[in-house]
Structure formats: structure tokens, C-alpha cells
Curated annotation (Swiss-Prot):
Belongs to the L/F-transferase family. It is found in: Cytoplasm. It comes from Cupriavidus pinatubonensis (strain JMP 134 / LMG 1197). Functions in the N-end rule pathway of protein degradation where it conjugates Leu, Phe and, less efficiently, Met from aminoacyl-tRNAs to the N-termini of proteins containing an N-terminal arginine or lysine. The keyword Flavoprotein does not apply. GO terms for cellular component: cytoplasm. Pfam families: Leu_Phe_trans (PF03588). This is Leucyl/phenylalanyl-tRNA--protein transferase. Keywords: Acyltransferase, Cytoplasm, Transferase.
Length: 250
């Protein structure tokens, strides 16, 4: 039995989340409240929302937790060449926070294998849009010939980044945005990106599962650090990244 949260109720301890033998491992609580204040409270405790249209807001704390250290992003020799070409070619641009809400809508509308519909509801877009307006959520966007062709968004608290979703309308467009994000976060001492749930795709990018207790220790430390400001794309940071040896494939 999970907890039902009224607007002023605290979250229960994450250890009460449903276990691996249940139909919904990691499910902790449900509510109608999806205010920016509730979201911030959740992220600072390693909790995230994930639900479908017609459901209450479902709150999760998975164990293990999938995370990506910025320096662990797997960059093949082929993709490294792609990044170098993108950095040289004026047809390509990488932008930060050009249109956060447009990125969210693109993530919501992009079909995904094995998913029917989207969890990025109008309420989700409004809540994260409010965080963005307060400098606590950001988008990294890949543009080609004046059109946004890929991107991602997430929440930034202190030196912790919580990845939410990404999309691509052109080959490698979302991965280009992810590489730019990792280069930026790595240059600011961010130890990890929260990827939430374990998937083969995330593992192929270099993400790995860690125990929830270890993840929460990272969250407490990193989120208490000063926030990164300003958020902007520095081409030279990604150029230095592409100059390092290619990550061996595993």
C-alpha cells in the first residue's frame, strides 16, 4: 500500500517504496499535487514523478538508480568525428535554454518504442516550466539550418542534474545535446546525472546502476553545493572533450 499525499504532506521515507518483487518497483506515493514546490522537495530526496494521463501523480524512488557520470559518456571514434564536424559546420548549432517549453513539447510528441502515449502531460510541462522560469530547469538543444532537431531537458539543483527526457528528429541529434551537457557539467564539477530508471539504451551511453543509498548520499552532497550560473554553451569546452582519446567500446 502506497501513501496518498495531500498538498502539505511530506513524502514518506524512500525505503517504503515498493520492492523489486512487486508490479511497480520503486513506487512510493501518489498525489494530485504537482506544484514546483512539491517537485523540488521530491528531487532533493531522490524522488521523481512518472505517470500517465488519467492517473494521479505517481512518485518513484527506484533501487538501484541509473546514473551517468559526465566523464563516463561513451563516445565512439565515429561519434567523435560527428561532434567535430558539428562544431566546425555553421549549419549546426548547440543552444542552451533557447525555448525550454518547446523542447518539453517535442519530447512529449516524439514516438518511443514500447510506449503508448506520453507521461509529459500539460501539468508536467507547466510545473517544469515554472522551475525553468526560476533557473532550476534547463534545456540543451541541437539545431540544424535554423530548425531544432534534437534536445533534452532536466532539473539542476546545486551541482546535481536530473535528466528528464530527450528527443531526436535527426540522427545523433539528442546524443549531440547529451555530449554538450556532459562537457558543460563536467567542467563545473557535477559528479553525476540522474537517469532514473535502468534501460539498455542508457547503459549503452555509459550509465550504470548504483544502490539507492549511495545515490541519496550523492544527492545530499551535490544539491547542497552552489548552483551553476550562468547556463550557456561554451564551444571550447566541447572541443576539448573531442580532443581526448575515444572511449573504448564495451
Amino acid at each position: 500500500m502506497i501513501a496518498w499525499l495531500d498538498p502539505h504532506d511530506p513524502f514518506p521515507p524512500v525505503e517504503r517504496a515498493l520492492g523489486p518483487a512487486t508490479e511497480a518497483p520503486g513506487l512510493l506515493a501518489a498525489s494530485r499535487d504537482l506544484s514546483p514546490q512539491r517537485l523540488l522537495l521530491a528531487y532533493r530526496q531522490g524522488i521523481f514523478p512518472w505517470y500517465s494521463v488519467g492517473q494521479p501523480v505517481l512518485w518513484w524512488s527506484t533501487d538501484p538508480r541509473m546514473v551517468l557520470a559526465p566523464q563516463a559518456l561513451k563516445i565512439s571514434a565515429t561519434f567523435r568525428k560527428t561532434l567535430r564536424r558539428v562544431l566546425r559546420d555553421p549549419d549546426w548549432e548547440i543552444r542552451v535554454d533557447d525555448d525550454f517549453l518547446a523542447v518539453m513539447r517535442a519530447c512529449a510528441m516524439t514516438p518511443r518504442e514500447g510506449q503508448d502515449g506520453t507521461w509529459i502531460t500539460r501539468e508536467i510541462i507547466a510545473a517544469y516550466g515554472a522551475l525553468h522560469s526560476n533557473g532550476m530547469a534547463h534545456s540543451v538543444e541541437t539545431w540544424y539550418r535554423g530548425t531544432r532537431v534534437g534536445g533534452l531537458y532536466g532539473v539542476a539543483l546545486g551541482r546535481m542534474f536530473y535528466g528528464e527526457s530527450m528527443f531526436a528528429h535527426r540522427t545523433d541529434a539528442s546524443k549531440i545535446a547529451l555530449a554538450a551537457l556532459c562537457a558543460f557539467l563536467g567542467s563545473h564539477g557535477v559528479p553525476m546525472i540522474d537517469c532514473q530508471q535502468e534501460t539498455d539504451h542508457l547503459a549503452s551511453l555509459g550509465a550504470r546502476p548504483i544502490a539507492r543509498a549511495e545515490f541519496l548520499a550523492h544527492v545530499r552532497n551535490a544539491s547542497a553545493q552552489p548552483a551553476i550560473t550562468p547556463w550557456w554553451f561554451d564551444k571550447s569546452v566541447l572541443e576539448r572533450w573531442t580532443a581526448t582519446p575515444a572511449t573504448p567500446a564495451v
